[in-house]
From Swiss-Prot:
The gene is ispG. It comes from the Bacteria. Its cofactor is [4Fe-4S] cluster. Its EC number is 1.17.7.3. This is 4-hydroxy-3-methylbut-2-en-1-yl diphosphate synthase (flavodoxin). The keyword Transcription regulation does not apply.
Amino acid sequence: MSYRPYQQIERRKSRQIHVGKVAVGGDAPISVQTMTNTLTTDAEATIAQIRRAELAGVDIVRVSCPDQESTIALKEIVREVNVPIVADIHFHYRRAIEAAEAGAACLRINPGNIGSAERVREVVKAARDHGCAIRIGVNAGSLERHLLEKYGEPNPDALVESALEHAKILQDHDFHEFKISVKASDVFLAVAAYQQLAEVCDHPLHIGITEAGGRRTGTVKSAIGLGNLLWAGVGDTMRVSLSAEPEEEVHVGWEILKGLGLRHRGVKIISCPSCARQGFNVIETVAALEERLAHIQTPLTLSIIGCVVNGPGEALMTDIGLTGGGGGRHMIYNAGKTDHTIAADGMVDHIVTLVEEKAARIVEEEAAAKAAAEQAAQEAALQHETV
């Protein structure tokens, strides 16, 4: 692909922290998060749900810990999954300490509702002792009373002031491994608050539109809000909040990042909405391909266009392309060039095979290049030693 300046996004410069093995902020990739909706005390169900999210590509998972039974179960959950776990804590400072001891990689708290300064000190000590990061989670629906009285309602100034007050509490304890979120269900409020916060601090930001709604409504609201922020370079880690299964949140989060070219994973399908000119059933073909190609993680682009109006042009910019043609024959493109024609029968199977083979070649080539680079580095090191 050619270099296109209009596609470049300059990300906000932020401090880098670590949530377990995942770097957040700085030049680290924007991580995708979700949250379980099982009872945390049901460790088996929670682990199964996290594993489904892992298959979808999640980087970090948040788990609610409302009681001691949950923090007890958390230890098993952390042990059995492959991604860092954030323990969601409200009000009960002991739960935060227990979660840190259980192996949580991050504690999601509001220092202001944990209790006395002594309790905050104990939580910070537990986080430091166990290598936990902290997420300061400000939400328009649970702002402190004094800020509501000061501003009259949740607004960007109130959210940012709350976030900075909480950040100062941690900084006063010489704790700096934290990220901040200022979420709201209103897209305008959330975006404005994040933009304002991004201008006054360099802490990594967890972005999200809270209580966004069901699958369709929540996806649209999140795409508008998060897409706006990410396009402006704001955001180091993100969650799409949906009234849906966690893996669906992960899928949508990845699609937002892929749409902006910020991360790449799996097959990106470019397809037309179809019309009377289509040479094959585009909608059914795309649905089948999305399902059949979901297992591929190697970044690839695939165009599925029903006719020759836009098909050849789209195929120029994709790894593999399909354009509907006449007489029941359709053109397959490889790397933007015409390659061969195919009939509708068996077309989906054929494209799946082409994509799988190309993905396998890319993996092999990348592995070979990595091995060659490592070999060259070893030889250079040996040569340096003999000089």
